Swiss-Prot record:
This is Probable 5-dehydro-4-deoxyglucarate dehydratase. Keywords: Lyase. The lineage of its organism: Bacteria, Pseudomonadati, Pseudomonadota, Alphaproteobacteria, Hyphomicrobiales. It comes from Bradyrhizobium sp. (strain ORS 278). CDD domains: KDGDH (cd00951). Belongs to the DapA family. It catalyses: 5-dehydro-4-deoxy-D-glucarate + H(+) = 2,5-dioxopentanoate + CO2 + H2O.
Length: 314
């Protein structure tokens, strides 16, 4: 069980960069615990405020309900309290509660509540869903506002009154007006996380709206670049930010946008580039082609900080 209160967890993750480690798989697509332990230990050596086990980049959608707590338990064991470990949960309410409780038992410090599977629901239904998950555990919960689970400010305010352990709001929409209304309504009651794909692109404007942190997928394979970029965002160092976007982030996005599902696939490909091969993505996702791998390799190796990541893997 976590030793952190929901409020302590929220304060910690709001103080620095966050990331979602990939879930390594073997050739037969089974969980590769050895590689996962190695990756988690390595990532903990960098300045990161929280790691999300079995999150979106960790292919939560392809894990079974039994695999999620298994992955979380390994993450908690390997990080050894160096950083908070948060777990993904989602799907329908019954399954989300089941995964939430098993993740709490496995030692997770908090939860990221992903949108329910496929269905669109009214605000009252979404609110009841979030409340049911929050009340099934004692650890802190972060709601992920995106796709078919968009909570409006008034709904969020009511949930915060009913659920003291609802401590975070992750935005995956990019609706500036909605984000402004949420922050204006809730203020410092919540910790706000930027959660758009390749969040570095939106980090600076979001900082001015009270979003002090974001989840960096590229932290998985270029952690030094990711932490340097985050530091530049906090300092509002426009020159460094724009150089990072131009030289790395935007070219990476160009490769990612070629095929559906590449938001996850390209991160696992990046792990392979630096010598930390974490196996294939699970179906229905597909891996990068050889030509795309060559492009990504050239892009990563052009980074001055890429050499240190590769040396650490050797």
């Amino acid at each position: 069980m976590s030793k952190m209160t929901p409020q302590e967890m929220a304060a910690k993750i709001g103080s620095g960069l966050l990331s979602f480690p990939v879930t390594p798989f073997k050739a037969d697509y089974s969980f590769d615990e050895t590689t996962y332990r190695s990756n988690m230990d390595w990532l903990c050596g960098y300045d990161v405020a929280g790691l999300f086990a079995a999150g979106g980049t960790g292919e939560f959608f392809s894990l079974t309900a039994a695999e999620v707590p298994e992955v979380v338990k390994v993450a908690v064991d390997e990080t050894k309290g160096r950083v908070p470990v948060l777990a993904g949960t989602g799907y329908g309410t019954a399954i989300a509660r089941e995964i939430a409780m098993s993740a709490e038992k496995a030692g997770a410090d908090g939860l990221l509540l992903l949108p329910p599977y496929l269905m669109h629901a009214e605000q009252e239904g979404l609110a009841a869903h979030v409340e049911a998950v929050c009340k099934s555990v004692k650890i802190g919960v972060i709601v992920y506002n995106r796709d078919n689970a968009i909570l409006q400010p008034d709904t969020l305010a009511r949930l915060c009154e009913r659920c003291p352990n609802l401590v975070g709001y992750k935005d995956g929409i990019g609706d500036i007006e909605l984000m402004t209304r949420v922050y204006t309504k809730m203020g410092d009651r919540l910790t706000y996380i930027g959660g758009l794909p390749t969040a570095e692109t939106f980090a600076l404007p979001y900082l001015d709206m009270g979003v002090t942190t974001y989840s960096s997928a590229v932290f998985n394979f270029v952690p030094e670049f990711a932490t340097n970029f985050y530091a530049a965002v906090r300092k509002r160092d426009h020159a460094t930010i724009h150089a990072g976007l131009k030289d790395f982030i935007l070219p990476l996005i160009a490769i990612r946008n070629r095929k559906k599902g590449y938001a996850v696939s390209i991160i696992k490909a990046g792990m392979k580039v630096i010598g930390r091969d974490s196996g294939p993505v699970r179906l229905p996702l597909t891996d990068l082609t050889e030509a795309e791998m060559a492009e990504l390799t050239a892009l990563v190796k052009a980074l001055p900080v890429a050499a240190s990541a590769q040396q650490a893997a050797e």
